[in-house]
């Protein structure tokens, strides 16, 4: 999604949003990530939230010139990796084995065997279409954010096919975006 993303080429407009839209976004994010309820006012302060419209119907939620969350076609909101590194417990975790790391860092989707092999881990609460944080075996910080395409039980029983669609990963265009004006 953000492999070759740059603000100059892909963001068409940035605008201040109405308070009602702002409340709606905060409510959606609070509902989606209940562990952030205590700190949501710090993450998304009133009056400083902007929406940047990008290509492919992507909305970027910008606070203090930094992208905090994004979504595509009014789908679920995903945190950026910078925010996820500040609040690592905000979303369910999945860990892939060492063999999948270089492919994930290249933007590839993650196959089920990457989670079922020796270094893999899948959280109990994983359902289909759940935003998840992807960790590498033996590493402290998340390397990607993804959307599950299989439930936990399907990952272990089928053990083939795409388990997680990678939507944002370390060193992609969104990671390298330092500010949105």
Regions found by a protein language model. Give the residues of each.
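Beta-strand/loop-dominated core regions that host nucleotide or nucleotide-derived cofactor-binding catalytic loops
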Residues: 2-58, 62-120, 125-126, 134-181
């Amino acid at each position: 999604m953000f492999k070759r993303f740059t603000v100059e080429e892909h963001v068409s407009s940035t605008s201040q949003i109405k308070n009602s839209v702002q409340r709606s976004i905060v409510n959606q994010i609070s509902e989606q990530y209940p562990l952030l309820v205590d700190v949501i006012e710090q993450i998304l302060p009133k009056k400083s939230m902007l929406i940047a419209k990008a290509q492919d119907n992507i909305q970027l939620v910008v606070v203090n010139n930094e992208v905090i969350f994004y979504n595509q076609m009014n789908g679920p909101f995903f945190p950026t990796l910078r925010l996820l590194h500040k609040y690592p417990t905000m979303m369910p975790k999945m860990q892939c084995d060492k063999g999948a790391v270089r492919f994930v860092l290249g933007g590839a989707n993650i196959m089920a065997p990457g989670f079922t092999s020796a270094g893999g881990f899948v959280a109990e609460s994983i359902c289909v279409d759940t935003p998840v944080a992807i960790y590498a075996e033996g590493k402290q910080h998340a390397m990607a954010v993804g959307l599950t395409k299989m439930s936990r039980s399907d990952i272990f029983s089928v053990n083939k096919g795409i388990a997680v669609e990678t939507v944002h990963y370390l060193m992609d265009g969104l990671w390298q975006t330092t500010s949105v004006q």
